[in-house]
């Protein structure tokens, strides 16, 4: 079966593994998924990210993060810009997720950035997802 939206699939796999309290998640690799995983690690939503080379496209191993009492660090993931309806925002209109408690992941001319980084670099772009 052909996957029409690999980013939505990646976010759904993270959401499902998080809801099931899994420690580790493995997904087929792509450059944009690597970028999203690195942003999630940098922003503290996941513990660690590993990239495993194989005969094909590679695998991304994501280590999910939980609090001391088992509470979930990622409470929500939402795909914003979809293949059928792209969502672009100018630098003045960049969204704030939960008044700054969450992040928006954007694809910009500077690469994949969070909403805060895009404001600092003064660039807009395609809103990929919200994470909170």
UniProtKB/Swiss-Prot annotation:
Organism, scientific name: Streptococcus gordonii (strain Challis / ATCC 35105 / BCRC 15272 / CH1 / DL1 / V288)
One BP annotation, GO: translation
Gene: rpsH
Family matches, as SUPFAM superfamilies: Ribosomal protein S8
Alphabetical list of PANTHER family matching this protein: 40S RIBOSOMAL PROTEIN S15A
Protein name listed in UniProt: Small ribosomal subunit protein uS8
InterPro entries recorded: Ribosomal_uS8, Ribosomal_uS8_CS, Ribosomal_uS8_sf
GO cellular component, one term: ribosome
Biological function: One of the primary rRNA binding proteins, it binds directly to 16S rRNA central domain where it helps coordinate assembly of the platform of the 30S subunit.
UniProt entry keywords in alphabetical sequence: Ribonucleoprotein, Ribosomal protein, RNA-binding, rRNA-binding
Residues annotated as signal peptide: none
């Amino acid at each position: 079966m052909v996957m029409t939206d690999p980013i939505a699939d990646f976010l759904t796999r993270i959401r499902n593994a998080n809801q099931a309290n899994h420690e580790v998640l493995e997904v087929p690799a792509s450059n944009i998924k690597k970028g999203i995983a690195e942003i999630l690690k940098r922003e503290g939503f996941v513990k660690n990210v590993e990239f495993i080379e194989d005969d094909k496209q590679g695998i991304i191993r994501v280590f999910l993060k939980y609090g001391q009492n088992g509470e979930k660090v990622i409470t929500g993931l939402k795909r914003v810009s979809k293949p059928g309806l792209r969502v672009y925002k100018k630098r003045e209109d960049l969204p704030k997720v939960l008044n700054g408690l969450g992040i928006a992941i954007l694809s910009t001319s500077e690469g994949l950035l969070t909403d805060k980084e895009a404001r600092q670099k003064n660039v807009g772009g395609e809103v990929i997802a919200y994470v909170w």
